[in-house]
Amino acid sequence: VARKNDHPNVTVIGAGLAGVEATFQLIRRGVRVKLLEMRPKVPTGAHGTDLFAELVCSNSVGSNLPDRASGLLKEELRALSSYILDVAYKYRVPAGNALAVDREAFAREITRYMTGHSHVEFVNDEATEFPEEGIVILATGPLTSPRMLAWLSKTFGADKLAFFDAIAPVLTAESVDMTQAFVANRYGDAEEKGDYINCPMNKAEYEEFVTQLLAAERIHLPEFEKDARKQLFSGCQPVEEIASSGKDALRFGPMKPVGFTDPRTGRRPWAVVQLRQDNLLGSLYNIVGFQTNLKHGEQERVFRLIPALKNAVFTRLGQMHRNSYLFSPAFLTPTLQVKDRPDWFVAGQICGVEGYTESTGMGLLAGLNAARICLKKPPVVPPPQSMLGALVKYVTFEGHKVKEFSPMNANFGLLTGTTAPAKGESAESRRAAAIVEARRAFKAFIAEL
């Protein structure tokens, strides 16, 4: 256990997913933490509460299936006692094979625990630079304040990179016309009770929807340069941007109908809009994949063209915001320490990962290694064959070029250590082999901790 005193051993800047996870990994090992969070004193433009670990973009934490990259990463993080994932499972809402949470209950539980812990000194203030002494974990996230970004850019001598992100609307369940919708999971059994509300559309309805979507007025963003499409992270592309790439783009994206049969017709719909439960009560649903930057009045007008949503009551409308991150390969080691300042760590989305689970993983590793330094132990690096190790390798790989580096989700393309596929070998068998190797390597890693 770390030496106990009245002063924090580590300063964590930011109480998002990464900052909270880092803090937990420290305090569970007896290390005292000063946790700084600027909200609500300094708003971000995207967050709506003063709660820690607020989920802004979506309430889905990704796939829960063990043969999916996100599922494998969750398995690894739970083996390392991830606090964020423990709370996520506690406040889980039905979402098929995905892990989705009641975001308010989730954030309230985390805020209560962190602010009430004897080893956490919480400070509600903006950090504009690192403290002069002590170990620091930067976990300010993609909505880092301009003043902190300016200090980071000056300190690290590397320009920040940026991309734009978008948020999907949320509506009340009772306002959905269930005579025009059905409950089911994609490829679900007819006897199975589904988790998603599915809003089918025929060809004429879909084409009119796309026409109106493309014609709708968008919110003007002065920062949205002419080549900004390159800066849009693919996992959170605004629905209007997807539609602009082709008339059927939405049917092969968030509105794909495969795996569904409309019970009214007995046939597959032309397109389907999915609604996912957003809270434990089941009174709120979000529109899956419908991140948007349309003007608010236009969102209501266009989205009500979906037959089941003709009377939709929206509790939150979509918006776009700028997400910033650092070119971490220039200055981060695989332990998430700054190369010439081993007492500084960078974690979460600001270091170049994308996704809730991925951010949590970076926070976990930073917190674990900061704790090990406090305990006079060497920092560790997860094996590159594992999903966590593969993400770490991505954000610290020195071969990256600045303009080619962009936020990365967990995916099997990142994994190393598998043998070359034999002729005729399927993608499924290669993935299965990669999972076996990832589990073997990660088990050995944990055994050495």
Name the predicted role of every residue range:
Residues 4-18:
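Beta1/beta-strand and adjacent pyrophosphate-binding region of the FAD-binding site
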Residues 24-85, 384-395:
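N-terminal FAD cofactor-binding segment of flavoenzymes
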Residues 40, 350, 369-449:
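Glycine- and aromatic-enriched mobile tails/lids
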Residues 54-65, 89-105:
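Dinucleotide-binding Rossmann-like beta1-alpha1 core, especially the glycine-rich loop
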Residues 103-122:
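Helical element adjacent to the flavin cofactor pocket in flavoenzyme catalytic cores
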Residues 116-276, 281, 285-296, 300-301:
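Predominantly flavin-linked oxidoreductase catalytic cores and closely associated redox partners
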Residues 287-353, 360-362, 378-397, 402-409, ...:
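A glycine-rich dinucleotide-binding beta-alpha-beta segment and adjacent secondary-structure elements
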Residues 358-373:
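An active-site-proximal "capping" alpha-helix that borders the catalytic cofactor pocket
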